């Protein structure tokens, strides 16, 4: 059966719909993947906010009780901090996530692994994946591992 006669009209119709959607999106207020390069001022704001989270994450990673209290989290009930098992952020490998995580026996994200460490070895209370504490820990861990090539799914 020759399907080329049916395929061409479908292709043309699909292309027309895609073009129309693009045109409709261009007139909206919604930004479409950086229409223009960011200004130096914008980049400074972005970096300053990121580094605020990195500094907070560093405090949490190293067991700062005041930072935990301010955020309402309990990362450990054993007196352990993330840095005790991962000095200088060693053996964290955020560039490998998501992946199958042997300790958890499931496919996991970095946030899943952070909570696993909080709950299991540290006997702390899991933190919400969208919380400021989680964002800060994640920012610090990624920042500490900058330069590592992305390798999701590897060990």
What are these regions (language model features)?
Residues 57, 79-89, 137, 141:
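The canonical Cys-X-X-Cys-His
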Residues 3-16:
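Bacterial N-terminal signal peptides that target proteins for export
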Residues 103-115:
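Short microdomains enriched in Cys/His and/or Lys/Arg
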């Amino acid at each position: 059966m020759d399907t080329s006669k049916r395929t061409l009209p479908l292709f043309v119709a699909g292309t027309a719909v895609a073009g129309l959607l693009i045109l409709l999106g261009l007139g909206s207020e919604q930004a479409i993947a950086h229409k223009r390069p960011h200004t130096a001022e914008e980049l400074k704001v972005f970096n300053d906010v990121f580094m605020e989270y990195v500094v907070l994450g560093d405090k949490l990673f190293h067991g700062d009780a005041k930072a935990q209290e301010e955020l309402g989290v309990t990362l450990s009930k054993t007196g352990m901090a993330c840095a005790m098992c991962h000095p200088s952020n060693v053996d964290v490998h955020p560039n490998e996530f998501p992946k199958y995580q042997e300790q958890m026996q499931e496919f996991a994200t970095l946030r899943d692994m952070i909570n696993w460490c909080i709950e299991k070895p540290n006997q702390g209370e899991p933190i919400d994946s969208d919380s400021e504490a989680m964002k800060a820990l994640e920012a610090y861990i990624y920042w500490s591992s900058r330069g590592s090539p992305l390798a999701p799914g590897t060990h």
